[in-house]
């Protein structure tokens, strides 16, 4: 019985050691990658100066063209991310402050997102590789239910968000495979023709107090 318990303890210790090693390896890869997403680009940049910065979801990502502003002499970047909510754009703005960005004008997309305090799991996952390195990210997520697990259990955050920051994404980051998200200064036009407009009655909607929106105003 003692031998069996000792064997189990060895297995647990081995698994813990493997998790620690994997956590370190994945983290090193991500903190040295700046060409896969707008979040890793933001994390690995500092002291940027812009005349105009766009923040928001696909409505920003697919529609605001920095080149048009650049032609008028305004240094511009589109930090919009498809599927992001106000919570994620608030954290982007905080990271810009943390990275000592100097921005003259910020255009924030609000629209119907003001009516929900929800978040995007897909976009939240993109911040997780830097949870240990960024005090700003830790402070932003300290109240979410899974925070302690994500912070304290080795490799847990990479397993929890495997679909977005798992092995495949880590491998592409390690070999320096770029995506197109940073092309055109962050502007990503829709490739296909837009479908028909969907009729919607917006009269039932009205602005509500949004925690992330208030958070963004306090940063600005």
Model-identified regions with their sequence ranges:
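Membrane-embedded segments
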Residues: 55, 59-147
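Secreted/periplasmic serine-hydrolase-like ester/acetyl group-modifying domain
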Residues: 123-220
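Soluble or luminal CAZymes and related metallo-dependent hydrolases
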Residues: 34, 85-88, 215-216
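N-terminal hydrophobic targeting signals that begin at the initiator methionine
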Residues: 1-2
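Alpha-helical transmembrane signal-anchor/signal-peptide segments
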Residues: 27-49
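Acidic/glycine-enriched edge-of-secondary-structure segments
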Residues: 22-29, 75-83, 204-214
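Hydrophobic membrane-insertion alpha-helices, especially the h-region
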Residues: 6-26
């Amino acid at each position: 019985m003692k031998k069996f318990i000792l064997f189990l303890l060895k297995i647990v210790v081995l698994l813990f050691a493997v998790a620690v090693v994997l956590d370190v390896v994945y983290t090193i890869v991500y903190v040295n990658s700046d060409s896969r997403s707008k979040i890793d680009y933001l994390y690995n940049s500092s002291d940027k100066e812009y005349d105009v910065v766009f923040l928001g979801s696909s409505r920003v990502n697919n529609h605001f063209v920095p080149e048009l502003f650049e032609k008028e002499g305004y240094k511009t970047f589109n930090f919009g991310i498809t599927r992001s909510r106000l919570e994620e754009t608030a954290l982007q703005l905080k990271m810009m402050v943390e990275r000592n960005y100097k921005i003259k004008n910020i255009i924030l997309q609000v629209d119907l997102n003001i009516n929900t305090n929800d978040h995007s799991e897909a976009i939240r996952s993109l911040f997780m590789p830097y949870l240990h390195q960024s005090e700003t990210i830790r402070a932003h997520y300290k109240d979410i239910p899974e925070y302690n697990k994500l912070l304290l259990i080795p490799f847990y955050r990479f397993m929890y968000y495997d679909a977005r920051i798992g092995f495949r994404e880590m491998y592409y980051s390690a070999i320096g495979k770029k995506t197109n998200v940073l092309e055109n200064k962050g502007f990503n036009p829709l490739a296909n023709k837009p479908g028909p407009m969907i009729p919607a009655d917006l009269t039932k909607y009205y602005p509500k107090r949004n925690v992330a929106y208030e958070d963004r105003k306090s940063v600005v």
